[in-house]
Amino acid sequence: DYRQRLLNVRVMLSLRKALFDRLLHLPLPRLWDMKTGGILSRLTGDIDTTTGLLQMAVVSPAISVIRLIIAVGLLLSLNWRLALTALAIIPGVLLMSLVFARRVKPIYRSVRKDAEEIDGRVGETFSGIRVVRAFRGEPRERQDYMRGRHTVLRKELFAHRRELVLWGSWGLLMSAVNVAIVWYGGLLYTGGRASIGDIMAFQWYSFLLLNPVWSIVNTFSELQRSLAAMERVFEVLAMDDDKPDRPGAVEAPRVVRELRLENIEFEYRPGLPVVRDLNVTVPGGTVVALVGRSGAGKTTVTDLVARFHDPTGGRILLNGIDIRDLTLRSYRDLLALVQQEVFLFDGSVADNIAYGRHDATQADVEDAARRANAHEFIVRLPEGYETFIGERGVKLSGGQQQRLAIARAILASPQILILDEATSNLDTESEQLIQASMADLLAGRTTFVIAHRLSTIRRADLILLLDEGRVVERGTHRELMAARGGYYDMVVRQMESDAHGVHGGVLQ
């Protein structure tokens, strides 16, 4: 029992490792379709449901088959005619089990899908607990949760009723076998081909046949739940990786001399282009500001540079090499990302700053924090750099979160920086500290910044105004203001808003 349990634990651990690794490398659109609840459901619930599958699918049936072979041998040695009568049960059992599997496994598959939806909803509820409480949504969330759980319960009870039918049918088959043995044994006795003792002994030994057959049927019944969960696990394992390296892929150069986007086209869905005919050459160390209204394609451009997606047309060249001909790992080593909505992990301040540099020393972490103007507030925290900041950094203010994200990017020391500037309004002191740390972050790096603040845009070497995925204007701030086009109109509107105290200096 210990060895079987140990084997189960090792198999489940290997399965979890393989599944987690595959999930880490799935294309982003697939992950977005699965949702967090679906991912957690497969990693935990589905694999937990398969615990003991090896025992059920291999060990128990193997033991039952050995017992079945021994029983058949004994029965044949006693009376081959009666043995054939008893063996007639096996085709009926096989047919009954196949019918049961066809009807029950879809139910269990549906149960796992419903459980996934419930897990996802629970995750959303507690991620947005402020909204739930502010809008008095607790009764609705409780009702939705219980409705989902009752649906799962009804389906499980329905499947269990099907199992009861299977067990009842098995009882009828056993009774039929006993009746057949007595009836046919009586015929053999009257014909002088069997004694009463033979018939009684045969009837007793027939249980040696029926018990392993029943064990196989029972195992087959229990197996359906595990197989439904296992199918969902292997469905993910069978998915293709995000971007496997091309044959002959080479390591990325360590210094960025030029990044060129050449005839770039991209669409999430066929026939709906998001980026069209994008051409731009970015010398190393250049700061490129992407501006434009919401939905213009700014984030998609930065996602293409980061290779979160590959273009559907055109190519991106790093020092003249198509980035798809570089190993993804070495290319991503050149990158750092600062998102508009800062993402911090539920760990210590130091762990979050060093996330991109696992070999960083405490001195490295503190130096990055100082350059991001974060050191002073960090040392005032209860445990300093070892203070745990909660899931998504909920124990920190918005300005503190942004400075930690900047410190993380500074410590990563990237050649290429992708910055989606935060649009949230901050107090004057936080705004000034962040702007000062931004100057350190951008210095000497090839940077693509989705810019919202005029101060950041003015700092850019090249400004691209995007509209419906196309670059409609390009140049420096001075050049575009002199051209008095769409960029000029945006800046004027922003300055008028600032004059009336609107938006807090955020360029919309």
What are the language-model segments listed below?
Residues D1-L13, D21, W32, T85, ...:
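Transmembrane-helix motif of ABC transporter permease domains
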Residues Y2, L6, R10, S14, ...:
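Cytoplasmic juxtamembrane "membrane-exit" helices immediately C-terminal to transmembrane segments
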Residues L19, L23, V132, V233, ...:
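Helix-loop junctions and hydrophobic alpha-helical segments within the transmembrane domains
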Residues D245, A252-Q508:
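ABC-type nucleotide-binding domain
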Residues Y2, L68, V72, L76, ...:
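Membrane-embedded alpha-helical segments of multi-pass transporters/permeases
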Residues L74-A88, F158, R162-E231, V236-L237:
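Helix-loop-helix
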Residues L23, Y145, V233, L261-N263:
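Conserved catalytic Walker-motif region of ABC-type ATPase nucleotide-binding domains
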Residues L28-P29, G45-L54, V58, A62, ...:
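An intracellular "coupling" helix at the cytosolic face of ABC transporter transmembrane type-1 domains
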